[in-house]
Amino acid sequence: MSKAIVVFSGGQDSTTCLIQALTQYDEVHCVTFDYGQRHRQEIEIAKELSSKLGASSHQVLDVGILNDLTVSALTRDIPIEENKDGNAIPNTFVPGRNILFLTLAGIYAYQINADVIITGVCETDFSGYPDCRNEFIKSMQTALMQGMDKQLTISTPLMWLDKAETWALADKYNSLELVRHQTLTCYNGLKGDGCGTCPACILRQRGLDEYLANSTMYQAQLAAKCTE
């Protein structure tokens, strides 16, 4: 029996990954992390979506210590700054977040004998976060396998997709409207189309507009990438 764990926030990317995973594995278990994020509504949305979509289980883990150790606009009452310098790390970056999340997901995978951890990180539209890059993911996979003496794959279905192609993937599984209206990506905690002004909303909306303007082209691009 194949088992996978989805690192699940209830946002566009992780929900799209969950929808796909449910077609690929016998059991799909979700894990959500409470790290004191400002957009805390995502935790409740993650609970609702994991149940609605049919995940085998859903765990919410308290990692509030991350908020104690780090200072980020995602966890503190700090204005979210626009990252005008593409080489700079934005102030929404939470240092160590994906290191911690993937480590805990790896421990969970060990306990339930799952061989795959799925995360929605993406290098194409990675917002300047160093822990969303493919090089980091491969390093984490190696560290987890060596540290636990277990065969484990960290799967990143969105790694080389842009936001328009991520919308195409949701549409491929007839879930574009669900992802659009029932997920939470907004840094200000607004469901669906969000506030429209934070960096996450701008990136998400631009991708949606591009996809809707030429869905046939993006579906073809998605199909080509999925067969590479």
From Swiss-Prot:
Zn(2+) binds at residues 186, 195, 198, 201. GO terms for biological process: queuosine biosynthetic process. Its EC number is 6.3.4.20. Keywords: ATP-binding, Ligase, Metal-binding, Nucleotide-binding, Queuosine biosynthesis, Zinc. It comes from the Bacteria. Gene3D superfamilies: HUPs. Pathway: Purine metabolism; 7-cyano-7-deazaguanine biosynthesis. Binds 1 zinc ion per subunit. One of its GO terms (molecular function) is ligase activity, forming carbon-nitrogen bonds. It is an enzyme of class 6 (ligase). Disulfide bonds: none annotated. Its cofactor is Zn(2+). ATP binds at residues 8-18. It catalyses: 7-carboxy-7-deazaguanine + NH4(+) + ATP = 7-cyano-7-deazaguanine + ADP + phosphate + H2O + H(+). Catalyzes the ATP-dependent conversion of 7-carboxy-7-deazaguanine (CDG) to 7-cyano-7-deazaguanine (preQ(0)). NCBIfam families: 7-cyano-7-deazaguanine synthase QueC (TIGR00364), PRK11106.1 (NF008317). Belongs to the QueC family. This is 7-cyano-7-deazaguanine synthase. The lineage of its organism: Bacteria, Pseudomonadati, Pseudomonadota, Gammaproteobacteria, Alteromonadales.
